[in-house]
Design a protein with these regions (language model features):
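Glycine-rich dinucleotide-binding loop and its adjacent helix/turn
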Residues: 116-132, 191-211, 234-296, 410, ...
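Short FAD-binding loop at a beta-strand-to-alpha-helix junction that anchors the flavin cofactor
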Residues: 36-39, 277-279, 421-445, 449-450
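Beta1-alpha1 glycine-rich phosphate/pyrophosphate-binding loop at the start
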Residues: 2-24, 36, 54-66, 71-77, ...
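Local cysteine-cluster metal-coordination motifs and their immediate loop/turn environment
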Residues: 36-59, 82-103
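Extreme N-terminal leader/targeting segments of oxidoreductases
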Residues: 1-34, 84, 104-137, 242-256, ...
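A Rossmann-like FAD-binding core segment of flavoenzymes
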Residues: 187-235, 258-267, 294-414
């Protein structure tokens, strides 16, 4: 039986000079080998404990392995409207719960999903789903990111007339402006949006709700309002020197390059070309910044993280089938990004012109629980040093929804963590990150489906 394939990327020397998808396409035989590995579990945990969408992974793998690709696509499409997105940008929670991963390596479920959906598109099986009849109700969806698009698709299939509003020039939200092309080429997004438009979903872009159009206007003219606006408020680093030039939020940096790639700008507003780049924050957004900076021609790229270095294998603190805490190395890290853990930032250092020139940091030592979970850090004496940098990117996550726009106009209450509290009694709903806090694309989609189901039940009862 074939094992998991680890080398799935295009050559580093090739991919670091373009924004094309970093992953090389696996041929049908290689994917089939992975699908056949899926048949060795007794009770599958991948689609229950793992996938938030409850994709029927063993079923679509079994169908495709037997050559029934159309049936595999039909099984996948019953639970996932946009597998071409999740098969590229999801961390594959399903693989963390794969039975093959208990004593070995998980099946490459994400690659199997990608092969199925791309085969479906190439074969002409992905067709617009136009509901047989409309129910006479109109829904306004504010935000066209993962949760907004997923909810719009679900509501449209239920017979609602759906209009999706987007503040940016083009629809897609985070998928278009926040995720680099080397992970998700925008032609894939445009391909799906074209299908959705043929289904009758209306997209109104370049429209800021709460400024260009009031949220109350939407409530007067639609039967319900669904906010799917994400959590764009980035977590800041309030240390001395924060006012220096050359310190930017990660999303600002990523959006600029994506707008260049999409033809909206001639040059990125924030460029890493020729600079020593320091990324503060060790998550996926920081990794995306690293890959983008490398492609822009940065002199050096370093990513620092206050958390400890994860173990090479699953930590006992996250036993199977939980999502494992363990070291993960992205395609961007392999392209020339240095990584450091246990690093806390103290002060930004500036030059005579008022630009950032470095960051004073110190190391921390973590206290761990008996099963290896990091509990709290303490400064390491004598570890102070300065990391040179003339471009600093803050990638430390997001704090919630800003006190502006539709949420402010509607005077919605918030949780202690800044998430919006929907008010169905006022016909106001919220889905995805704005209602739950920043999380994964696939979790935002799963929540959008749950909210759309609730809206359907309440509005048609």
């Amino acid at each position: 039986m074939k094992e998991r394939i680890h080398d799935i990327y295009r050559p580093v020397g090739e991919r670091r000079h373009d924004f094309a998808e970093v992953e090389a396409a696996l041929d049908e035989a290689a994917v089939r080998d992975q699908m056949l590995r899926c048949h060795h579990c007794g009770i599958p945990f991948c689609h229950g404990a793992g996938c938030p969408l409850f994709n029927r992974i063993p079923d679509f793998n079994a169908a495709a392995a037997e050559g029934a690709w159309l049936e595999a696509y039909r099984i996948l499409a019953r639970t996932s409207y946009f597998p071409e997105f999740t098969s590229r940008i999801c961390p594959a929670l399903c693989e963390g719960s794969c039975c093959s991963g208990v004593n070995g390596e998980a099946v490459m479920i994400r690659q199997c999903e990608k092969k199925i959906i791309e085969t479906a598109f190439a074969s002409g099986w992905v067709r617009p789903f136009v509901p047989p009849r409309r129910n006479g109700r109109r829904i306004a969806v504010v935000g066209s990111g993962p949760s907004g698009l997923f909810a719009a698709e679900h509501l449209n299939r239920a017979g609602f007339a759906v209009t999706v509003f987007e503040a940016n020039r083009k629809p897609g939200g985070l998928l278009r402006y926040g995720i680099p092309d080397f992970k998700l080429e925008k032609r894939l997004l445009d391909r799906r949006l074209a299908v959705m438009e043929q289904e009758g979903i209306v997209f109104t872009a370049d429209t800021r709700i709460g400024k260009d159009v009031s949220a109350r206007y939407l409530l007067r003219n639609f039967d319900a309002l669904l906010l799917a606006i994400g959590t764009p408020a980035a977590r800041d680093l309030a240390i001395p020197g924060r006012e220096l030039a050359g310190i930017h939020f990660a999303l600002e940096f990523l959006q600029g390059q994506n707008r260049v790639n999409g033809g909206e700008l001639a040059a990125p507003p924030v460029s890493a070309a020729g600079k020593n780049v320091l990324i503060i924050g060790g998550g996926d957004t920081g990794s995306d910044c690293a890959g983008t900076a490398i492609r822009q021609g940065a002199a050096s790229v370093r990513q620092i993280e206050i958390m400890p270095r994860p173990p090479e294998a699953r930590s006992p603190s996250t036993p199977w089938p939980a999502w494992p805490w363990m070291l993960r190395t992205s395609s961007s890290h392999l392209e020339g990004c240095e990584r450091e853990w246990n690093i806390a930032s103290d002060r930004f250092i500036g030059d005579a012109a008022g630009r950032v020139a470095g960051v004073e940091v110190h190391e921390v030592v973590w206290e761990f629980s008996a099963d290896g979970k990091p509990l709290k850090p303490a400064p390491k004496p004598g570890s102070d040093r300065t990391i040179p940098a003339d471009l600093v990117l803050l990638a430390m996550g997001f704090t919630g929804v800003p006190e502006t726009g539709a949420a402010a106009e509607l005077e919605l209450k918030r949780t202690p963590r800044g998430a919006l509290i929907p008010e169905p009694g006022r016909r106001i709903y919220a889905a995805g990150d704005c209602a739950n806090g920043a999380s994964l694309v696939v979790r935002a989609m799963a929540d959008a489906r749950k909210v759309a189901e609730r809206m359907t039940e309440e509005l048609l009862s």
